[in-house]
Structure formats: C-alpha cells, structure tokens
Amino acid sequence: MVIAGVSPPTPSSENLLQEHEEKHFTATDVVRDVIIGVSDGLTVPFALAAGLSGANVPSSLILTAGIAEVAAGAISMGLGGYLAAKSEEDHYMRELKREQEEIINVPDVEAAEIGEILAQYGLEPHVYNPVVNSLRKNPQAWLDFMMKFELGLEKPEPRRALESAMTIALAYVVGGLVPLSPYFFIPFAKQAMITSIAVTLLALVVFGYIKGRFTGSNPVLSSIQTAIIGALASAAAYAMAKAVQSV
C-alpha cells in the first residue's frame, strides 16, 4: 500500500537499510536487574560487615554472617524480581484480553481510536484512513497496534520473570562478595574493614563506568555518580547499624 505523500521504498533505499547497522542498546530490563542486584549487593553486606567490625568481633564471624546475608539477600531480591516481572506479565494479559473484547464488541470505536493515535503524529485523515482500514482487515496486527500505541504495553518475554529473578540474585551475590572479600584474607576485623571500604569504592567506580558504557551515558560521570550514591547509602546503613548497637 502506498500512502499519499510518501514515496515507496526504492531498491537503493532498501540497500541502504540493509547496510545500515543500528547501534541502539535494547536490553534495558537486563541492565535494570543487574543494577538493582549489584548496587544492593555492594551496599547491604558492606554495612553489615562494617557494623560488626566496629563491635570487635573476629573476621571469621563477620564472614559467616556476611555470607549468610548474601545468600538470604539473593533469594529475597530474586523473589522480588520474579514477582514484579510476573505482575507485569499478568497485567499485560488482562489488558490484552480486554482489548480483544473491545475490538470484537465495539470495532468502530476502536478504529476511531486508531485515527486519534495517528493524528497525534500529525497525520491527516486522508493519510491514516487507509492504515485504519488495513488494520481492521488484520485483527492480530490491530490488537498489537492498540496494545503498543494506545496502552503503551510491550509483550513480555515468556521467561522474563525467571530470567529477572536469576539475574538479580546472581548480581546480588557478585556485588555482595566484593565487600566481604577482605575478610577472607585479613584476620583482624578493623583492618579488613578499611580494605573493604577501599575495595567497595573501587567496585562502585568500575560498576558505574561499565553501567555508563552500556546505557549510553557519560561513563566517567556515571562512575562518579554511582560511587557517591553507593558511598552515601553504605554510610547511612553503617550509621544505622552502629546506632542499633549502641541501644
């Protein structure tokens, strides 16, 4: 179908499309899960270990408590990620069923909504009416269009909930082992805590830089921002731990 005012693709334009390589990063859900897992993993076990270090307990006890917290935190965070992704999937399916019923029961209203959506992009009725008619002949394409452009919902991946749970849990474990690593090698808790602070800050800087590279933001700015936010969060958690100990 040729839309008025729009030239059909020519062989040369099709060749250009084939030669052009998009460099957009689209795995935003995975990046979000990794950020959630690693950032929490770097912060919570560090605060626990630092708080126990101030109580003059041996490194072995801190290590045992820290590993137990990492295991429990990974399970909890993973379960939270699973439930969140599952809720999104359930919401999508409910809206999909509702939209299917509306297309069957009130097709003229739904067709008018297509026109309203396309008009928001500056298209005139004589331009978008052929598009509306084409979509009415293809119910599945019509349904997909309404889900995406009317409701703003993307179809979740079938295994998204499980993948989210595994990604967050694994990222939490990786992040949590970083501040605990000095306690494996340094028997004196306060010395291990100083090393843990340095290692955790370095990990936050590296993590922020990598995050910036993947998300397209300034890597240096991202690393500084991540380090500052992580340091403030860790300091707040440490202060709360010390306050509880003093009660």
UniProtKB/Swiss-Prot annotation:
Fe cation 3 binds at E102, E110, E113. Fe cation 1 binds at E99, E102, E110, E113, E150. Expressed at high levels in the blue epidermal cells of the inner bottom part of the petal (at protein level). No detectable expression in parenchyma and epidermis of the purple segments of the petal, parenchyma of the blue segments, leaf, stem, bulb and root (at protein level). High levels of mRNA in the blue epidermal cells of the inner bottom part of the petal. Low-levels of mRNA in the purple segments of the petal, stem, leaf, root, bulb and pistil. One of its GO terms (biological process) is intracellular manganese ion homeostasis. Residues 1-33, 82-167, 213-219 are cytoplasmic. Disulfide bonds: none annotated. Its main location: membrane. It catalyses: Fe(2+)(in) = Fe(2+)(out). The chain crosses the membrane at residues 34-54, 61-81, 168-188, 192-212, 220-240. Keywords: Ion transport, Iron, Iron transport, Membrane, Metal-binding, Transmembrane, Transmembrane helix, Transport, Vacuole. Pfam families: VIT1. Fe cation 2 binds at E99, E110, E113, M146. It is found in: Vacuole membrane. One of its GO terms (molecular function) is manganese ion transmembrane transporter activity. Residues 55-60, 189-191, 241-247 are vacuolar. The keyword Membrane applies. It is a multi-pass membrane protein. GO terms for cellular component: vacuolar membrane. Belongs to the CCC1 family. Vacuolar iron transporter involved in the transfer of iron ions from the cytosol to the vacuole for intracellular iron storage. Plays an essential role in the development of blue coloration in tulip petals most likely due to the accumulation of ferrous ions that can form complexes with anthocyanins. Expression of VIT1 with simultaneous RNAi silencing of FER1 results in cells of a darker blue color compared to expression of VIT1 only, indicating that VIT1 expression and FER1 suppression are critical for the development of blue color in the perianth bottom. This is Vacuolar iron transporter 1. It comes from Tulipa gesneriana. The lineage of its organism: Eukaryota, Viridiplantae, Streptophyta, Embryophyta, Tracheophyta.
